[in-house]
Amino acid sequence: SPIVTHKDSNPMAKSIYIRFEWAMKRLLRDKANHEVLEGFITSLIGRKFTIVKFLESESNAQDSDDKFNHVDILAENEDKELVILEIRNEHEYTYFHRMRYGASKVITDNINLGDDDGRVRKVYSIHIVYFEFGQGEDYVYHGYTTFKGLHEPHDTLRLSISETERFLGVKVKHRADTPSAGELFPEYYVLRVNDFDQTARTPLDEWISFFKTGDINPDYKAPGMERARQCLRVDSLTKEEYASYFHHMDNLVYARSALESAFERGM
């Protein structure tokens, strides 16, 4: 959604809905509201996920610096496989540097999940960015690891039958049925919110439209959107939550002003 400027007397006057990154670290941690995040993740990845818990890493702390709008989630897919989902909302122009090591930090921060450790199937690193990020014609990008042969470029490294069972818990009979070795490595999704300038045609488009405009069209039917209409209203906040949200919005204005000034000076 558009970042308000100091010209606005009330930073929250533009929308009746709460900004997603603030809600993500606070309201959406409530189990009653998990449907919102689950709906967004399902719309993006194309598989149904159920949140098991929020991982209490340092970056998940609710009182951390506002610029680190970041949560780590342990979730289960429809095949009962556990995955870790890292979701970041960012306004930093140096974001490529953070993205480079973020997924690795998620893994090291949460390497000891007790009985769940061996069941973690995948890490998804989801990045919602609100600034000019790289160059490209699309507004959603998907990155993943593929191992190609150096001397046989058409050859892709695959897991062996035993590795497939050991690492993924899947039994296969034929070598041709084993997955790519890249399946063991994190996948990245980048949503360049400000580059979305069209009518929402898919459930994911509806979510991105909400991220950009701060508004939820009455016709939107994406997974989780109906619950978002109910729990993300500004007028539903308590007095304490309202004060915290106002402080967050004011910090957002200041941070963007400082970043843009530094960017213009070539810093």
Labelled PLM ranges:
Residues 2-267:
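Elongated, amphipathic alpha-helical interaction scaffolds
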